[in-house]
Amino acid sequence: MSLSTVNHAAAAAAAAGSGKSFSAAAPAAPSVRLPRTRAPAAAAVSAAAVGADRAADRVSALSQVSGVLGSQWGDEGKGKLVDVLAPRFDIVARCQGGANAGHTIYNSEGKKFALHLVPSGILHEGTLCVVGNGAVIHVPGFFNEIDGLESNGVNCNGRILVSDRAHLLFDLHQAVDGLREAELANSFIGTTKRGIGPCYSSKVTRNGLRVCDLRHMDTFGDKLDVLFKDAASRFEGFEYSKSMLREEVERYKRFAERLEPFIADTVHVLNESIQQKKKILVEGGQATMLDIDFGTYPFVTSSSPSAGGICTGLGIAPRCIGDLIGVVKAYTTRVGSGPFPTELFGEEGDLLRKSGMEFGTTTGRPRRCGWLDIVALKYCCEINGFSSLNLTKLDVLSGLPEVKLGVSYNQPDGQKLQSFPGDLDILEQVQVKYEVLPGWQSDISSVRSYSELPLAAQRYVERIEDLVGVPVHYIGVGPGRDALIYK
């Protein structure tokens, strides 16, 4: 049976307006939901206490330097876990990427915050947030984000440090990003148009400007002139004049004054904090399948969102890094172009997209949706050495008569592939072998104890653990902070 057997449920789900889970399929006879026996108050309190103890044990056991990394193509829900873990850490640090990352978190009152560059620990007053040298900084966007936070009562004063080694992302990088995509025509990458790739290109070709250059405005204009001329020589559609340069320099003089209190030698700050036994939580942007080296190249980002990016993006020694938590949706999504072996098309994909509200935080683009790809997940686990997984959006699968796991890839001739292929010609032709498991009908969004999950949901979680060889310690069953099960 496939997802198409429950397509008729979409209308009912839309009418219900829940936006959380699939409606239960009822092809022949109405399903009967047995009433749940209400537990005595004392037992309920005891269960809550056990859950709280398990949560405290899980979080307190994390190493001094821990990381939260994406293990698909992004949008897995990393920000929520970082937000939940942040109160137990002194510092939350971003190591790579820029405003192309979109992390959605909720405060204790349920107010939604969409962060792009500011680390997700910002909602916790005692947490210092660090944007490391591996990130790229669009200063106007950074200030817009801070202004938005402060207008909603979040104090950012003295709580964010930006590496003096981080590269500056200019509006010209964003313009070049759009021109580059237009030039590629039908083979475009599908970037966020935030200028990330062109900025990293400037970094690699060694004509980029860094945050520390804002302290030397006497030479800033000459360096920026090189960038403008480079873009103008490369793209006919890029207009450049000396007046544009003067305006941009004057603009950045104002930015430099405001940014100065945020600028720090974050390599020194972080390593000194490690010596002082402070706890550091690293928040990865994007995900391993978008890694410039290990992702589905060229449909990737321009940085390293895998474990290696922590060291190079923050200046932390490998021996200091302990627990790494891989965040993975209970199904798979992808924004933009590139191979997606388990993708669902037509009404099947639409149903999953609507139920999971799968639209990009940064771009608003509808995400491509499909079944959980175990081959890709296992590959990510191997690269990063995850100590545990956070399985998110399990509630979205509620109501399906069956759920599927893509457990292996076969070539067109039927030969099984032994690993995740780097060759896109091979990857685009693979035939996915699925393992079918029974679904569950009940709404699990209010469940807070693993033992209270339907048995079918528990089997799904445990089968994932068996297949990838990494334990699932955290299970997301809704968007709020409290919608998390500690296993």
UniProtKB/Swiss-Prot annotation:
It is found in: Plastid, Chloroplast. This is Adenylosuccinate synthetase, chloroplastic. One of its GO terms (biological process) is 'de novo' AMP biosynthetic process. Binds 1 Mg(2+) ion per subunit. Belongs to the adenylosuccinate synthetase family. Its cofactor is Mg(2+). It comes from Oryza sativa subsp. indica. Its main location: plastid. Homodimer. The lineage of its organism: Eukaryota, Viridiplantae, Streptophyta, Embryophyta, Tracheophyta. Substrate binds at residues 361-367. One of its GO terms (cellular component) is chloroplast. InterPro entries: Adenylosuccin_syn_GTP-bd, Adenylosuccin_syn_Lys_AS, Adenylosuccinate_synth_dom1, Adenylosuccinate_synth_dom2, Adenylosuccinate_synth_dom3, Adenylosuccinate_synthetase, P-loop_NTPase. Plays an important role in the de novo pathway and in the salvage pathway of purine nucleotide biosynthesis. Catalyzes the first committed step in the biosynthesis of AMP from IMP. IMP binds at residues 75-78, 100-103, 192, 206, 286, 301, 365. GTP binds at residues 74-80, 102-104, 367, 393-395, 476-478.
